[in-house]
Amino acid sequence: MSSVSTRTLVLRALGELLPHKAIPPTSLELSLALGCTSEELNNAFIETFTLPTDETLHYLSSEYLAKTISPLTGRQDVTLIHSRRQEAREYAFRYNFYETYAGELMLASTERGLCVSLCTFMDRSGALERIEQEFHPKALIQSTSAFHDEALCHLTSLGKRASLPPLHLFGTPFQCGVWEAMLHIPSGRCCHYQDLATLVGKPRGAQAVGTAVGANPLAPFIPCHRVLPRTDTLGDYYWGSALKALVLLPELISSPLY
């Protein structure tokens, strides 16, 4: 099975997950829903995650996810530059497209750091249009960047070894505070929205924090995929719960709790 068709089958399977269900479906249930054999599905999951379907999806059960909730103590060692959104007009954005285990990403950076990461879903013109509409940069220049290379190395290491490049954040002070707070979540571990709210000094502001999490411009490098609802289920994700699972699972599997 080609890497593209393998990813397609895995994404279709992950798309069958209900974001707020405590127990994931079984391999048999998924193969029946997808019209494939359990063997085909297991082979796709082993190629993607190194484990067969049922063992992989156990990591997304609420029983397991509850154990991953981690105190927000140390933060990743990364340089952060905070700017208001309207200041993006003062910068040229250098962008390019990169194939990753999570699909094609469009990365963009200013002269100061990585500023945008978008899942293109193979719609490059749509990704460019979104950057134009949201940031109105002074210029968009297709080019590689050392910031992009550092970010991709970090992603390949599942956030464990390679450091992040400087991150140039365009947002309100509150948004930037929430985005910075997510850098306290270790790879292979998760937190609740309420935990982030407490960390940024807004213990009753979980809903506002959730909105800021959803506006994260640098997923998966700022790891909003590690934030869960109080029910300890997968929860929602701007790019869809299937992609959240695709990004989160390799981290959970590489840092097992048993």
Positions of predicted regions on the chain:
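Short glycine/serine-rich loop segments
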Residues: R204-L246
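Basic nucleic-acid-binding alpha-helical/helix-turn surface characteristic of O6-alkylguanine DNA
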Residues: M1-R204, E251-Y258
